[in-house]
Amino acid sequence: MQNKKIKKVKVGNLEFEVVLADNFIKRAFGLMLRDIGDKAMLFLYKRRKIAMHTFFMLYPIDIIFIDKNRVVEAVRLKPWKTYKCKNYSTAMLEFKCSDIDLNEIIGEKVEFMR
């Protein structure tokens, strides 16, 4: 799969249009001080335990951690918090806080679409 061509991510029955964090600046800043509307931001990594923060965030966010095309962990964070994923992950999807029951999506299949 060519990473730059990913336009959508499907998590179970949910579908997200994504902005790919495909360079150092986008990965470093993520959603800090910006609003990408209803889209989500997708981060791709080599398999590891991902640590992140919500410093300078303008709003709470939901974060979905993905490994082997399955949701392995999901969390809702307010601004000015830190979090380290307890599971190994190869991708992270972050988006504005929603009404999704994050516990319900653990284990859901994830599809990366063009």
Curated annotation (Swiss-Prot):
Pfam families: DUF192. InterPro entries: DUF192, Saro_0823-like_sf, UPF0127. HAMAP family: UPF0127. Belongs to the UPF0127 family. This is UPF0127 protein MJ1496.
